[in-house]
Amino acid sequence: MNAVGISLGMKCDAAIWAVENSIRDTKVNGYQTCPFDEMISNLPGIIECLRDDFKYFCDPEHLSLLFTGKEHFVYNKKYRFAFNHESPGHDDLFKTQEWPEGLTHYINNNYAHFIERYQKRIQSFRNYLSNPKNFIIFILKRYNTYQTDLYELKKVLRLHYPNLNFHIIILSNNNNNEVKNTLRMLQFKEDEEEFDRLNYWCG
């Protein structure tokens, strides 16, 4: 079988780790970018998104521009995802990547270019998972997570892809402050389960 590494977040460092450890090909070598490779996600949101089969991922009704106090992020309110690689001004990507419409390229015309980009990435994800010749190695970076915590994720993957052969690699993230800041940025409140779980395990 053909092994394909695909990131499930929480940030793009999961995808970087997969490339550095020869679990995932680079774009130059033919890898087609998938939706969770270059964004900021959370496991409950990913499970809900997969359960919905990405129905609201690119829906402008659920997209907004979120100001975190330092910069603006394209934000999906339903799944609580942030898209830093398409956000105005983030790391001056609009300059280094030469976005055709400048700073606001991905939010212009009701997120038209954002939608186009992510529809392609969603289709790449579906293509990889639907190919019976592929063995999918998912890479998930998440704090204090074990295989026993992934029951719902595995369940929803099998629901939509019943013949899928896969394995999930968990990368630990024990930087408590970094995780808390990320959860706050994604609009999680400190009395929600993600914070409760973090506080219980990390103190």
Where do the protein language model's features map onto the residues?
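Extracellular glycan-modifying ectodomains
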Residues: 1-203
